[in-house]
Each structure stands twice: as C-alpha cells, then as structure tokens.
Amino acid sequence: MSVFVSGANGFIAQHIVDLLLKEDYKVIGSARSQEKAENLTEAFGNNPKFSMEVVPDISKLDAFDHVFQKHGKDIKIVLHTASPFCFDITDSERDLLIPAVNGVKGILHSIKKYAADSVERVVLTSSYAAVFDMAKENDKSLTFNEESWNPATWESCQSDPVNAYCGSKKFAEKAAWEFLEENRDSVKFELTAVNPVYVFGPQMFDKDVKKHLNTSCELVNSLMHLSPEDKIPELFGGYIDVRDVAKAHLVAFQKRETIGQRLIVSEARFTMQDVLDILNEDFPVLKGNIPVGKPGSGATHNTLGATLDNKKSKKLLGFKFRNLKETIDDTASQILKFEGRI
C-alpha cells in the first residue's frame, strides 16, 4: 500500500513525507522536474520506501494520468498538496485559478480512470482562504467556521493577486467536493480537506533556507531584516506550525471521523507585534537591530476583526498544536543559523 503526495517538494509536503516515512508508509511523491525529484529523494537519504514521479504541469487535466497508470493499483491514499501559491503573477486566471482547479480535477479524474477501486482516502490541502470573506475580515460581528465559504466569484476574485489566490483555493476545494458528489458510483474514496491559516515553522531541510522564503515564512524572515526605525507591517490572523499541518494531513486519512470534513488548522491569533516580541526576547543577536514596536500590545489581537472558530476541527484532530513562541523560535533560529549569526 502506498501514499501518493502531489507537490512533494513543497514546504508543507516535505514535512508530510517525513512523517509518513517515520510511520513506515511507502510514499510516492511528485515534483515539477526531474532535478527537483532527485533532490528530494536525496534529501530523504534515498529511502527505499520513497520514490518520485515528475508531473511538469498540474494545469493539464491529464497531468497525473501516468502516475496512476503506473502505481494506481498500489495507491490507497492520495494527499493532494500541489497548488500554485505566489502573489507575483501577471494573469490571475492563467497563473492561479486554472492551475489550482485543473490540478484538483485532473488528479481526481486520474484516480477515477486508473485507481477507482484502490484509492480509499483523498486529503486535499485547501486553505483558510477558501473559508473566510476577505472583504469582511475586519467585521467583529462575524464568525467563520468549518461551514463557511469564501463568497468570491470567478470574476470578482481577479481584482488583485491576493484575492485571486483566495479564490483559487475556494474553487479548487469546491471542485473536489463536486467531483465526489457527481462520481459517487464510480469511485470509492472519501474526501477530507485541510484548511490552514498562516503556516510558519522551520523548513524540513536546512539547505532549503534561502534569502527569500515561501510566502508565510517570508513574513517572519522580513521582520528579522527590518531596521529598528522601520514601520511594522500591520497584519493579523491565525497561525499554525507547519509540523502540525503535516500531522493533520495524516490524521485526516487515519481517522474515520474526519471523512467528509473540512479541518481548519489554526492554533490561535497573532499580530506582527507578537512575532516581534518573541524575536526581541529570545534572540540577543536581533535585539537592537529590529523594531521594538509596542511590546505586549499584540494582546489586543483577539479584539481585531472576525472570529475564527475551529473548535470542531481541533476536537476531530485530537492533538495539541504548537504555540507561537515555539514556532517562531524554530523558524528564526534556522534562518539565523543559515546566515551564520548564531
């Protein structure tokens, strides 16, 4: 029995692969190029239980056909993590919306064609972006939970890259639930979505620390490189540690109770002030070199904006998430080691 992880070289996916291998699963991953595939198998020590396939372009509806033609009878679990996540785009529809939706439709059609009898569980890496209404995130009277959906339309979400990304996650997840509804008679798999908020935490491998990191971790990285007089970005939201997101993907297919559920993975709220407080307190090398802001004032973050209620998800998952201090400490220390500052 194998677990297939699409986009296995991604930030979250590498941690998923690590946990799967530690739990002795046989893992097949995909990446966009042979070079990325080889780099990842090497990073995992050429583990005999881990192999890679190349899927160059997930926006093509038959992109995953060859994977399931080759391994379909052996794959019981599919974790679809591959999706575009970048705000530096020129065409929202071409660069974000179509690849995200086609990636989901394509992989599910490939399962239907070549692994309808063998795949039992599918876990989709969605996002809190598919849940909340960006236009109303500052409305204190609102609560978003597992039943909530981003109200964006295909047209309205193309107003800017951030809205387009949020829309891409909504339409990709909707496509998955709709596919299952329409194909109940021809596939046996059950579906679960994992909807993380801002994902912080260390890279799986130190070698993957770069000058610029993936979008969420770059928020921490950029704070660490501000000057004391720089303005602190005004940002708040929910946070989760990447290692907890990875674990949530495993629990999502290991438990029967998670079938048909959307799992919002968020530990608590944060502001950039909270992150700065931790950086200044725990890293002497940063103290005096980055802004101080108003220490402790981040505590007001629970009064900011709409409420995120994920009590149901936390209960279903049944494990304790890491707190912000541990997450930021591990993220920052890895970056500082890479830079030779600690």
UniProtKB/Swiss-Prot annotation:
Keywords: Cytoplasm, NADP, Nucleus, Oxidoreductase, Phosphoprotein. Optimum temperature is 40 degrees Celsius for 3-chloro-1-phenyl-1-propanol reduction, and 54 degrees Celsius for 2,5-hexanedione reduction, and 30 degrees Celsius for the reverse reaction. Its main location: cytoplasm. Gene3D superfamilies: NAD(P)-binding Rossmann-like Domain. Disruption phenotype: Causes hyperfilamentation, probably due to the elevated levels of 3-methylbutanal in the mutant. The keyword Oxidoreductase applies. Its EC number is 1.1.1.283, 1.1.1.265. It is found in: Cytoplasm; Nucleus. Induction: Repressed by SKO1. During osmotic stress, this repression is relieved. Induced by transcription factor YAP1 during oxidative stress, and induced by ionic and heat stress. Induced by isoamylalcohol. NADP(+) binds at residues 7-12, 32, 36, 57-58, 165, 169, 199, 216. CDD domains: AR_SDR_e. GO terms for cellular component: cytoplasm; nucleus. Used as a biocatalyst, because the enzyme accepts a broad range of substrates including aliphatic and aromatic ketones, chloroketones, diketones as well as beta-ketoesters which are reduced with high stereoselectivity. Activated by glutathione. It catalyses: (S)-lactaldehyde + NADP(+) = methylglyoxal + NADPH + H(+); 3-methylbutanol + NADP(+) = 3-methylbutanal + NADPH + H(+); 2,5-hexanedione + 2 NADPH + 2 H(+) = (2S,5S)-hexanediol + 2 NADP(+); (S)-3-chloro-1-phenyl-1-propanol + NADP(+) = 3-chloro-1-phenyl-1-propanone + NADPH + H(+). The keyword Lyase does not apply. The modification Phosphoserine is found at residue 333. The N-terminus is blocked. SUPFAM superfamilies: NAD(P)-binding Rossmann-fold domains (SSF51735). Optimum pH is 7 for 2,5-hexanedione reduction, and 10 for the reverse reaction. Monomer. Belongs to the NAD(P)-dependent epimerase/dehydratase family. Dihydroflavonol-4-reductase subfamily. Catalyzes the irreversible reduction of the cytotoxic compound methylglyoxal (MG, 2-oxopropanal) to (S)-lactaldehyde as an alternative to detoxification of MG by glyoxalase I GLO1. MG is synthesized via a bypath of glycolysis from dihydroxyacetone phosphate and is believed to play a role in cell cycle regulation and stress adaptation. Also catalyzes the reduction of 3-methylbutanal to 3-methylbutanol. Acts as a suppressor of 3-methylbutanol-induced filamentation by modulating the levels of 3-methylbutanal, the signal to which cells respond by filamentation. PANTHER family: NAD DEPENDENT EPIMERASE/DEHYDRATASE, NADPH-DEPENDENT METHYLGLYOXAL REDUCTASE GRE2. This is NADPH-dependent methylglyoxal reductase GRE2. It comes from Saccharomyces cerevisiae (strain ATCC 204508 / S288c).
